[in-house]
Amino acid sequence: DPRGCLYGCNGSCNARCADYVEYILAKEGDVAAVVVETVRCTDVQIPPRAYYETLRRACDRHGALLVLDEIPICLGRTGRMFAFEHYGIVPDMVVLGKGLGGGVFPLAALLARADLDVAAEGALGHYTHEKSSVGCAAGLATLEVIEDERLLQRSTDLGARALGQLKAMQARQEAVADVRGIGLLLGVELQDAAVAEDVLYRCLAKG
């Protein structure tokens, strides 16, 4: 959150935190990967382009992988199939989930550069219902619907409209501290925790 930034960005992100990541990579010398949630889902923190450009250069310079967690925001929520497409960079790995199964079946995926797409003879851990053929069918159907119904453009258009309406509401409501959005990933930040809790339960009551 730029307003609470420890690096003195004074309310507008200057990507100094990304410079600090490079400092750590240089000092440590043996960091395997930098793992980042591309756009923070829970409170919709949207980094500037310079942030990811700096991270990408830093990882390349110091031999670390850039791994992006897009589990909660993948496949169109931001108006692009992958949120990292907004930043003009390509990660070494990207993790997908949630929406990948169309909201009806648990499914996750790890996409990787071709030279990293290797598997050992034995592996542990996995799950998310262990490579189910039903889940894979749901995932393929989801991708087809996104493409056939042009849902990426729909997300962009509806998101812009919704963000405009929310910003108009912000101008009328003193309780609203900030409004942020990218595609249909939208966030409204309220000034007061008690007001936020009241709004939460009113929303739940209305379904």
Where would I find each of the regions flagged by the language model?
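Conserved N-terminal phosphate-binding loop of PLP-dependent enzymes in the Aspartate aminotransferase
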Residues: D1-G207
